[in-house]
Design a protein with these regions (language model features):
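Amphipathic alpha-helical polymerization modules
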Residues: 2-236
Length: 236
């Protein structure tokens, strides 16, 4: 719920099987605290969030499959669906935390002569053609000049390590497959919102609370049964 308004955020869920295992252990193995405490794992829900209009030509959203690729100062690459970028003085498109947008030929750079010809505005003037254009196919054009092609990749979701809910690091051996423009559409001036559903999250919180209370009652009942057994054993 804390990331309800975070663009591109992907929610994290508990394995339902782990919760069922906890309940079964609590019901069937009284007094066995170790077996009643299995590891609880989580997974990321990569379903798309709603598209939100911003009007900023530096905001990009993906429709369909794939991820944007961004790169940090050490050359490590990350995948994200959050297309919120800012323009640096040397012509790079950066994420809020300083990673640079990657194209099919490496990190994208807008030539300085194109930047100096007409400064980029945060928003285009009404009725004017924006100086920076990203086509639905992922072509980056400035002043009508083709600067580069965004790298949009697909990957098996099990090959990603969650970094912060917005960015994901490929695991060693992960295969990143460049997607063709037929598999996605880039929407300029929009951002993909968080896929957190507040109603569903509240329902899950209530369900987890119910399971916790059930487990607590079972443990108390098991403890009471064990105490009675010990008391009876003293008279044998």
């Amino acid at each position: 719920l804390a990331n309800l308004s975070t663009a591109g955020y992907k929610r994290e869920l508990l394995f339902q099987s782990a919760l069922i295992s906890v309940e079964q252990n609590l019901r069937n193995v009284p007094g066995d605290a170790e077996s009643a405490d299995p590891p609880v794992r989580s997974y990321t829900d990569f379903s798309p969030g709603p598209l939100q209009h911003t009007g900023n030509p530096l905001d990009l959203a993906l429709e369909g499959a794939g991820f944007f690729v961004v790169q940090d100062a050490l050359g490590q690459r990350f995948l994200t669906r959050r297309g919120s970028f800012r323009l640096t003085a040397d012509g790079a498109l950066q994420t809020p935390d300083g990673k640079e947008l990657v194209g099919t030929s490496g990190v994208l750079r807008i030539p300085l002569q194109l930047l100096q010809a007409q400064p980029l505005a945060g928003e285009a003037r009404q009725g004017a053609v924006p100086p920076l254009e990203v086509t639905p196919e992922g072509e980056l054009r400035v002043q009508g000049v083709l600067v580069g092609q965004l790298l949009i990749v697909g990957v098996q979701l099990g090959q990603l390590r969650r970094v912060d809910g917005v960015q994901f690091a490929p695991l060693p051996g992960a295969v990143l497959t460049p997607l063709s423009p037929e598999e996605y559409r880039v929407r300029q001036g929009l951002l993909e919102g968080s896929n957190v559903n507040p109603v569903e999250e509240l329902v899950q919180l209530i369900e987890l609370q119910r399971r916790f209370e059930l487990g607590h009652r079972v443990i108390r009942s098991s403890d009471a049964t064990l105490e009675r057994s010990i008391e009876l054993a003293r008279f044998v």
